[in-house]
């Protein structure tokens, strides 16, 4: 028994900040950002627009796309590292917004790898037979964690949310396989310099960019190779590669090393920037809206995030 995606939806805040606009208050310029990241703009949530609001917008689109009633949902998992509050969870608040009662809801925190982690967790819960319809969300207000004086990090991130509706598959479609990993010894490569039990503040993002690039290439590539080998797949079997949208150089290098053809690689980082756990479901929603995905297509997701956390998943559409 495995789960399948029956609907998806994405949401980006209406405010768009281009590289040129960013350069007005940050020591940077459009050429510097484009060359190093491939990003031209990012969406930024308003002061009173929280992660739960972004999650709600994407969830409603996914529910409509799936053609189900909101009351069909029997579990909510929100993957986020930027909750509205220390507690309760974003998932709990979202449950209230949707008018649902007496169903479980919880947040999952694996940063940029959150959606892949969440997919494996959701699949296990559906496979148990205990849950029939799961709302899985990646939602982030990453700009709330940015130091706008640090041009090495503030240019990279944006806000947004992506949701999928998961149900048990009754044919050969759905999650084929996935793997997830972590390495706590490497946490100082990417972290926030604050936290509730540390100093009572959320802190700002601190990143060792060159080290993170090397780890991303090494770990995502190995994760994908392991999945290919375990399922007796070849790279040519992949119809679409949807990697975490962190940086165009990481995406391009991975595709090159794995020999994945350019037209199969989904890239949204240019317009979305890095939306952390939301980046893969947002990219999936963009691809689905294009009408390109066909039944039976093999989709490959792969991500790496702070922790370090990483993993990959194969889906048959």
Curated annotation (Swiss-Prot):
Function, as annotated: Catalyzes the condensation reaction of fatty acid synthesis by the addition to an acyl acceptor of two carbons from malonyl-ACP. Catalyzes the first condensation reaction which initiates fatty acid synthesis and may therefore play a role in governing the total rate of fatty acid production. Possesses both acetoacetyl-ACP synthase and acetyl transacylase activities. Its substrate specificity determines the biosynthesis of branched-chain and/or straight-chain of fatty acids.
Annotated GO MF terms: 3-oxoacyl-[acyl-carrier-protein] synthase activity; beta-ketoacyl-acyl-carrier-protein synthase III activity
Keyword NAD part of the UniProt annotation: no
UniProt-annotated location(s): Cytoplasm
Organism: Rickettsia massiliae (strain Mtu5)
Catalytic activity, as annotated: malonyl-[ACP] + acetyl-CoA + H(+) = 3-oxobutanoyl-[ACP] + CO2 + CoA
Active site (record annotation): 112, 244, 274
Pfam families, alphabetized: ACP_syn_III, ACP_syn_III_C
Protein name as catalogued: Beta-ketoacyl-[acyl-carrier-protein] synthase III
An individual GO BP term: fatty acid biosynthetic process
